[in-house]
């Protein structure tokens, strides 16, 4: 430690401890660093006595049973077909002519129409058959 450092007065430490105790009494939560450790268990709040008195005045509902969040199949739960969102997406077209037909039938708004790469694909997309070579 530095011998030239200013020493805290004992009165300052006491006032800090007093302020913390006052805060702990007003604040509804317990802080482990504000309470001294002791072997005696923590006492419940005074409000629990009042709430237990109120609880005794309430009528008992003995017929209540815990419910399941997911109902048992067949017991009150209607049988719905699985939603379409759970079905796997359709497989992509395997042939080039399928792709050409789909893009003509369902054109994309943002993208320009696809340009054919080969003359055979161009003839197929127009409805003509490709020229046969013998």
Curated annotation (Swiss-Prot):
It is found in: Cytoplasm. Residues 1-21, 108-134 are annotated as: Disordered. Keywords: Cytoplasm. Its main location: cytoplasm. The keyword Oxidoreductase does not apply. Residues 1-17 have a biased composition (Basic residues). This is Uncharacterized protein C3orf22 homolog.
């Amino acid at each position: 430690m530095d011998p030239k450092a200013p020493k805290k007065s004992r009165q300052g430490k006491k006032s800090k401890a007093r302020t913390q105790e006052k805060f702990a009494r007003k604040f509804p939560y317990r802080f482990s660093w504000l309470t001294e450790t002791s072997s005696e268990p923590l006492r419940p709040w005074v409000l629990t006595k009042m709430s237990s008195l109120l609880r005794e005045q309430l009528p008992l509902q003995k017929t209540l049973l815990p419910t399941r969040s997911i109902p048992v199949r067949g017991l009150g739960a209607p049988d719905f077909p699985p939603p379409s969102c759970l079905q796997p997406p359709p497989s992509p077209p395997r042939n080039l002519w399928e792709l050409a037909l789909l893009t003509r039938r369902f054109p994309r708004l943002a993208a320009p129409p696809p340009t054919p790469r080969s003359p055979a694909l161009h003839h197929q997309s127009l409805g003509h058959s490709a020229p046969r070579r013998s």
